[in-house]
Curated annotation (Swiss-Prot):
Residues 75-84, 424-434, 462-474 have a biased composition (Basic and acidic residues). The SMP-LTD domain is a barrel-like domain that can bind various types of glycerophospholipids in its interior and mediate their transfer between two adjacent bilayers. GO terms for cellular component: endoplasmic reticulum; endoplasmic reticulum membrane; ERMES complex. It is a single-pass type I membrane protein. GO terms for biological process: aminophospholipid transport; intermembrane lipid transfer; mitochondrial genome maintenance; mitochondrion-endoplasmic reticulum membrane tethering; protein insertion into mitochondrial outer membrane. It comes from Aspergillus fumigatus (strain ATCC MYA-4609 / CBS 101355 / FGSC A1100 / Af293) (Neosartorya fumigata). Residues 44-496 are cytoplasmic. Keywords: Endoplasmic reticulum, Lipid transport, Lipid-binding, Membrane, Transmembrane, Transmembrane helix, Transport. This is Maintenance of mitochondrial morphology protein 1. Component of the ERMES/MDM complex, which serves as a molecular tether to connect the endoplasmic reticulum (ER) and mitochondria. Components of this complex are involved in the control of mitochondrial shape and protein biogenesis, and function in nonvesicular lipid trafficking between the ER and mitochondria. The mdm12-mmm1 subcomplex functions in the major beta-barrel assembly pathway that is responsible for biogenesis of all outer membrane beta-barrel proteins, and acts in a late step after the SAM complex. The chain crosses the membrane at residues 23-43. The lineage of its organism: Eukaryota, Fungi, Dikarya, Ascomycota, Pezizomycotina. It is found in: Endoplasmic reticulum membrane. Its main location: endoplasmic reticulum. Residues 276-287 have a biased composition (Pro residues).
Amino acid sequence: MSSQLNDPTPIPAQSSLSFTQGFLLGQLSVVLLIAAFIKFFIFGEAPPPPSRGLSHRSATHRRSNSIFSSAQHDGSTRTLREKPSNSNVLRPVPSSATNTRSILRKTYYTAIPTNPSSKHGRHRIHHSSHQPESLDWFNVLIAQTIAQYRQTAYLLKDSPTSSILNSLTAALNNPEKKPSFIDKITVTDISLGEEFPIFSNCRIIAVDDPNSDGGRLQALMDVDLSDDNLSIAVETQLLLNYPKPCSAILPVALSISVVRFSGTLCISLVPASTPPLDTPSHSPSPPTAQTTTAGRSKREDQTSGSHSHAGGSSKEPSGENPPKTSPKSNVAFSFLPDYRLDLSVRSLIGSRSRLQDVPKVAQLVEARVHAWFEERVVEPRVQVVGLPDLWPRMGRTGVRTGDDSETGSNVPRSSTAADASGSARHEDSSREPEVLRFGSLLGTRPPFDLASRTSSFNVETGDLRSRSMTREESNGNLSDQFHMPGSLPGSGVATT
């Protein structure tokens, strides 16, 4: 009995084993949690930045696509019956034949369903169920046009006064826009690219417009351009003008390349009688197509008046002549706010110890390029370009060489036409040293007869305006001149 009481009770070994297992399991779980945190939260990939398209998508659908939304006609449109009796021979066109629905029906485009009136005074976009167009033929035409521009620019690279290098240098060194702390800007490299923009997914939409019957039609098309060879490189110096001029000089070299551009291009026809477009109050009001045309006609009148005074003519000053009132149609184009413009900016600052590819410089340049682009061709701002006169005229008639019908197509010209062509050629020769004349791009062009000539593109080297198309009629006078939108920062192109 006493031996049983003195024997010690054996301690079970499972208690120490279970404690060790629990301790190891706890340490392992902590290690796994730390490893997962480091892997997924520290070394994980950053989320992609929000796309411009997503940020502006709601604004795109809610925006007012009518560029006439805030302008109203001062008076009702006069019909042909209200004109003087000498114009009553022309039959009036019924409004039902010129509205949007009639145009879509007669061109076999899918009819647009009737939608209720817009809310809050906003203009509705009526999308069509018609199959979008591929625009393959349009891409070929645009590619040929761009290729001819590139070839012309290369052929004229050695021109002393009309090369693209001199034009860009004069534009970048405009004393009215270049700050005083920047020295002369020298263009060191220009590449016009090798690829071509691709247009696709063209669709026609109708926009509610109170100024027109049945709304207004717009063409929307997607455009995409990927070209690493579209670049420009410049060199300049930053000047420190305190306490005395040119106290310190810092050399700067920049290279800007357009890596990719994509967006939605919006094109619509604008009648010449449309009121001017509204601009935000914080920026100066840019000239519209009408003001540009009026200013250009005024300059032409002043030029013709100076010639008349120089020749001893007794006519009154041409500034008092009544302006031409023939209506002209315009094309308005712009890009939707959800565009994408990727730039590659390389910089080199300093002379001895140089800083290469400074991120802050790249950000400043990209912001300036985006601001320049949005101030000109991004909704609600549009570029307005006047349409040329497409009526067939003998002054623009030419004959292709090598055709069998060359003899039969050459009708005798009158002495008046010959004199007019002679005066036109004299004016062309007098203006030749001042402007860049784009000639033949595909070898030799067919020789035209005495009274025929084609349109010519002129590049002005004094400012940043791009090529202006000038057309001369058979009487040798300049007419119907309009300016294409610019493509460089600081451009003085008419913007709406």
